[in-house]
C-alpha cells in the first residue's frame, strides 16, 4: 500500500479547465489546473488579478455563475467527485464540510442582525439537531475561540460596533460553525492593516493546529504566503506556473514570473534600533511637529478635530453617541516634500486627508496653505481648498466615472482646477499621459476597459492636471497587485521629482512609506502618536506603538 493510499488527500483538483461564455464568445479562464490538499495543511494560491485564483476557490465551492462552463478535469473531495454532485449534495457540502472566508468582511455580515444571531443562525443551518439554546452556546464558544472579548456581552452587538479585525474574526467564526474540513480563505487579510493582518493569520494557524482543518489561502501578498502556508501554487493567466513547498518557492523560485513577484515585494529596512529620542517625538501623541522654518512650510494644520455623531443602532433608533474621528491633530508640511501618514483602520488618517482636500469638514482647528488660512468647518467649495489640494483615492475603479472616457475625465480636471482656461486642453492631456506612461489610444476608452494599474495612472494624471499645490494620496497602491504597486510607486517618485510636488502619502504599508516619504506621522485613534523624519521613525523611535507596527511586518521581507 502506497503512502498516498494510507494518507489520501482531502481534496484533489486534476486538469481543471473552465471557460466563460458571453455574447462576444468563449474565453478560457482556467487551463489544466492541478493540485492536492492534505488534512491539516495550509495551501497558498498566489497570483495577480485575473490569474484565476479566486475562480478555483469558487469552482470548489460551487459558486460559479451559469456562464462558466467546465471544459475538462475533475474536483474530488474526500474521494468523491464534486463536479458530479447534485445541487442538493453540493448545498449540503457547502458550509458543513467546506466553508469560505471572503475579503470584504463588511459585505459578509448583515448590518441589521447582531453578530451573535448571525453565528447562531449559521450553527442552526448546518446542524438541524441543535436546539436554540445549544446553538446560542455554540455561537458564544465560537466567538470566544476567534478572540472576541466578552463574547456573552458582545453577542448582542452589531457589526458596525466592531473594528475591522474583529469583524473578520466574526466571519471566521461563522465559517467554523459547521466544523468544516476545509476553509477557503479568499484574500482574508487584504483589507486589514499590518498588526490586524498578523493577528488574523496567527488565528488561522492556531485553528489549523487545534482542529486539523485544512485551509486554501488565496492572496496576492507574498508576505502573507511567507507567514503561514505549507505549500504554494503560483498562478498566472489561468494556469499553475509553479508549485512547491513554501520555503522552496521563496528561496529557490524557478519560474520567471515567481521571481518577478518576489522581486516586486517592497522591503522594510530596519537598522538596529537605538534608544535615542532626538529628531522626533516619542512622548506619545502630543501631535506637535518639530520646528521647521516658516519660509519652508507650505501647509500648517493646527488642532484639527472631527466629531461624529451616530445612533447606537444601525437603523437610526436610540440616542446618538458622539465619537471623535480626529482629536487635535497638527501637522507641518514642508514645501516640495512627501509626508507619510501611517495608521490602522479607524485611526483617522483618511478623514484627515479628506479635510485637507476640502472633501470633508472638521469640527475644530484650522489649515493654512502658504499665507492663506482656510475655515475647515466649511466644505471645500466654500472655503477655497478645493482645487488647491487634489486627492488620489485608494480604489481607481470607484473614483473614475464609468460613463466618461479617459479624455473627458482628464479634461474635466483642467476645467475645474487651477489650470482652468488652458488654451489647449487636448495638448495638456496628451503631454501628461505621455509622461505617465499611458498610451494615447486609451484616451477614447472608458475605465472598465483599462487595467488596475492603468486606471490608477489616470487618477494620478487627473490630480496633476488640476495643477494643485498639494496632492493627498490615500492608499494609492493598496488595491493593486504587487508588481503594479512597484510601477506606481516608481511613477510617483519620478513625478514628485519632475514636478517638485508636495504630497501627503497615506498608507498602512510601512515599506512603501519608507521608500516614498521624508517624514512620517503615526496616527492612532484619531491622534498623532509619533512623528519625525523617516530615518528616525524606522530606525530610532522607541514609541511602543510605532515598534508594534514595524514588528507586525512579515519578517521575510524586513531587512
Which residue stretches match the model-derived regions?
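Conserved ABC transporter NBD signature motif
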Residues: 69-81, 365-375, 385
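Helix-to-loop junction immediately C-terminal to a conserved catalytic motif
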Residues: 61, 65, 357
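ABC ATPase NBD coupling module
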Residues: 82-99, 117, 125, 132, ...
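A short, proline-enriched helix->beta-strand linker immediately N-terminal to the Walker B motif
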Residues: 177-181, 465-469
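Conserved ABC ATPase "signature" region
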Residues: 134-153, 424-441, 550-551
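ABC ATPase "signature
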Residues: 240-245, 252, 528-532
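Conserved ABC ATPase signature
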Residues: 157-162, 166, 446-450, 454
Amino acid at each position: 500500500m502506497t503512502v498516498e493510499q494510507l494518507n489520501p488527500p482531502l481534496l484533489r483538483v486534476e486538469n481543471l479547465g473552465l471557460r466563460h461564455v458571453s455574447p462576444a464568445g468563449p474565453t478560457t479562464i482556467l487551463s489544466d489546473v492541478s493540485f492536492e490538499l492534505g488534512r491539516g495543511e495550509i495551501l497558498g494560491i498566489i497570483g495577480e488579478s485575473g490569474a484565476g485564483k479566486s475562480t478555483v476557490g469558487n469552482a470548489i465551492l460551487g459558486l460559479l455563475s451559469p456562464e462558466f462552463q467546465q471544459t475538462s478535469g475533475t474536483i474530488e473531495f474526500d474521494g468523491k467527485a464534486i463536479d458530479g454532485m447534485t445541487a442538493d449534495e453540493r448545498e449540503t457540502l457547502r458550509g458543513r464540510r467546506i466553508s469560505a472566508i471572503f475579503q470584504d468582511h463588511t459585505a459578509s455580515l448583515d448590518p441589521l442582525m447582531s453578530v451573535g444571531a448571525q453565528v447562531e443562525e449559521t450553527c442552526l443551518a448546518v446542524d438541524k439537531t441543535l436546539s436554540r439554546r445549544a446553538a446560542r452556546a455554540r455561537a458564544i464558544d465560537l466567538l470566544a475561540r476567534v478572540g472576541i472579548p466578552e463574547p456573552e456581552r458582545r453577542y448582542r452587538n452589531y457589526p458596525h460596533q466592531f473594528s475591522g479585525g474583529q469583524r473578520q474574526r466574526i466571519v471566521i467564526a461563522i465559517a467554523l460553525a459547521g466544523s468544516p474540513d476545509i476553509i477557503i480563505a479568499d484574500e482574508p487579510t487584504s483589507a486589514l492593516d499590518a498588526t490586524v493582518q498578523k493577528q488574523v493569520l496567527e488565528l488561522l494557524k492556531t485553528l489549523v493546529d487545534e482542529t486539523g482543518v485544512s485551509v486554501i489561502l488565496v492572496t496576492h501578498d507574498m508576505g502573507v504566503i511567507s507567514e503561514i502556508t505549507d505549500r504554494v501554487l503560483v498562478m498566472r493567466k489561468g494556469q499553475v506556473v509553479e508549485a512547491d513547498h513554501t520555503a522552496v518557492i521563496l528561496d529557490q523560485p524557478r519560474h520567471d514570473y515567481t521571481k518577478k513577484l518576489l522581486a516586486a515585494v517592497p522591503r522594510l529596512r530596519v537598522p538596529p534600533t537605538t534608544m535615542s529620542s532626538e529628531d522626533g517625538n516619542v512622548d506619545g501623541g502630543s501631535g506637535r511637529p518639530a520646528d521647521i522654518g516658516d519660509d519652508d512650510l507650505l501647509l500648517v494644520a493646527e488642532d484639527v478635530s472631527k466629531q461624529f455623531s451616530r445612533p447606537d443602532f444601525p437603523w437610526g433608533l436610540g440616542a446618538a453617541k458622539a465619537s471623535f474621528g480626529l482629536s487635535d491633530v497638527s501637522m507641518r508640511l514642508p514645501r516640495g516634500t512627501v509626508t507619510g501618514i501611517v495608521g490602522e483602520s479607524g485611526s483617522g488618517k483618511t478623514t484627515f486627508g479628506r479635510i485637507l482636500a476640502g472633501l470633508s469638514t472638521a469640527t475644530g482647528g484650522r489649515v493654512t496653505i502658504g499665507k492663506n488660512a482656510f475655515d475647515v468647518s466649511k466644505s471645500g467649495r466654500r472655503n477655497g481648498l478645493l482645487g488647491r489640494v487634489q486627492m488620489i483615492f485608494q480604489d481607481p475603479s470607484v473614483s473614475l466615472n464609468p460613463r466618461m472616457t479617459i479624455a473627458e475625465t482628464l479634461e474635466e480636471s483642467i476645467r475645474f482646477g487651477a489650470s482652468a482656461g488652458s488654451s489647449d486642453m487636448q495638448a495638456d492631456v496628451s503631454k501628461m499621459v505621455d509622461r505617465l506612461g499611458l498610451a494615447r489610444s486609451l484616451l477614447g476608452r472608458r475605465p472598465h476597459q483599462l487595467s488596475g494599474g492603468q486606471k490608477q495612472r489616470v487618477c494620478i494624471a487627473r490630480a496633476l492636471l488640476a495643477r494643485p499645490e498639494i496632492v493627498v494620496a490615500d492608499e494609492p497602491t493598496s488595491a493593486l497587485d504587487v508588481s503594479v504597486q512597484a510601477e506606481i510607486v516608481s511613477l510617483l517618485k519620478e513625478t514628485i521629482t519632475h514636478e517638485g510636488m508636495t504630497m501627503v502619502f497615506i498608507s498602512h504599508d510601512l515599506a512603501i512609506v519608507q521608500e516614498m516619504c521624508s517624514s512620517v506621522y503615526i496616527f492612532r485613534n484619531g491622534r498623532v502618536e509619533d512623528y519625525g523624519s523617516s530615518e528616525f521613525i524606522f530606525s530610532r523611535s522607541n514609541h511602543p506603538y510605532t515598534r508594534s507596527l514595524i514588528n507586525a511586518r512579515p519578517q521575510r521581507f524586513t531587512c
